């Protein structure tokens, strides 16, 4: 069974969504995990759009959980956000 997961980092809300690539016609790629990052859990609950620049696909949930916070830090620095 494939389970999605979510966590928070520096006020951002991250949803990790598994996708079986066989459904996209690429069974050789197995299952990938995509990060959907929102400015807050409230924005996620309000069905706001995710931050497109932080949407990435990874080969494992561990890779997503390790790299997404790094990408968020870069995003904060690039956009000079106060977090």
Predicted ranges, named:
Residues 43-83:
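Mixed-charge, Lys/Arg-enriched low-complexity segments
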Residues 2-3, 14, 31, 51, ...:
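Weak global preference for isoleucine
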Residues 5, 16-18, 37-41, 76, ...:
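Surface-exposed beta-strand edges and flanking loops
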Residues 7, 14, 33-39, 60, ...:
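Hydrophobic beta-strand residues in large extracellular and virion-surface proteins
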Residues 27-51:
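Short aromatic-glycine-(Arg/Gly/Cys) micro-motifs in beta-strand/loop hairpins
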Residues 1-23:
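Negatively charged, low-complexity tracts enriched in Asp/Glu with abundant Ser/Thr
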């Amino acid at each position: 069974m494939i389970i999605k997961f979510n966590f928070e980092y520096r006020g951002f809300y991250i949803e990790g969504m598994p996708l079986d690539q066989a459904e996209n016609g690429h069974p050789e790629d197995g299952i990938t995990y995509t990060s959907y990052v929102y400015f807050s859990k409230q924005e996620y609950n309000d069905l706001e759009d995710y931050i497109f620049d932080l949407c990435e696909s990874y080969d494992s949930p561990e890779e997503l959980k390790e790299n997404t916070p790094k990408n968020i830090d870069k995003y904060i620095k690039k956009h000079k956000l106060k977090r």
